[in-house]
Amino acid sequence: MMMMNLLRRSAIAIGRQSKSKLASFSSATQPCSGIPKSSKRVFSNSFLSKDSTGANGLLFRFRNPQASICTEARPKNINSSYFTRSFASRTSKEPGNQQNKAKKEVTTVEDPFDSPTYHIPEKPVTFTEGASYSLVILAGLGVAGAAGYGVFKELIFQPKEYKVFDKALKRIQDDGQVRVRIGSPIKGYGQETRNRAARQRIPNRVFTDEDGVEHVEVNFYIRGPQGAGKVYTEMFKDKAEKEWKYTYLIVEILTPSPAKLMLESYLPA
């Protein structure tokens, strides 16, 4: 009895194991197993059945001479590529749009320091400031006028002492007695110094006598190739003839041999 029971139990266990193996094999070899029912497509040699479209996958299974095909409809690649290209185009356009916006911002922003300042606030000028500016301008004009008058007087209206000096020097240069003693040419100058301005300044004295006659007295130095001397002269302006005439003209030879020469002397008529 015990032997029979053991044989039954072993047979039952073997049967259960075989059933489980068959079930697993059938499930593994079953067409379209593991694929959602809503996405299966089954094709046979006699008819075509369409359940629905679904996710990815394609599976073939041959159970008998009559083959059945289980497929799974996949979305068209056009849609996925379209979405990919559209996304790429959007991402590629975004940097360009950002650059264009940045350029627009750069062009529209203005530097406040470059903008023209047409309205500069001006400080009102008071009466005192205006008067002081006017005085400064008038003083400058006065100085410029005085300088211009001095230059004009020196160039156009020669002073009286220089007229007497030029006339006396011309008379001495033409005199033979002086040329024999100091040589020729003879030059005249105001003072014995190397200062050019001092040499050009002629010592003089201007006065009017009791008759109302104007007199000019000058003295200057002369020098020639062989010697030098000093000149004393005085001239007056004749009212009748309106000319300058000598009162006297004396030349004192200093070198090489001292001598005094009276070249001109006025003798009233």
From Swiss-Prot:
Residues 1-70 form a transit peptide. Residues 88-100 have a biased composition (Polar residues). This is Probable mitochondrial import inner membrane translocase subunit TIM21. Keywords: Membrane, Mitochondrion, Mitochondrion inner membrane, Transit peptide, Transmembrane, Transmembrane helix. The keyword Methyltransferase does not apply. May participate in the translocation of transit peptide-containing proteins across the mitochondrial inner membrane. It is found in: Mitochondrion inner membrane. Expressed in leaves, sheath, flowers and buds. Lower expression in roots and stems. The keyword Acyltransferase does not apply. GO terms for cellular component: cytosol; mitochondrion; TIM23 mitochondrial import inner membrane translocase complex.
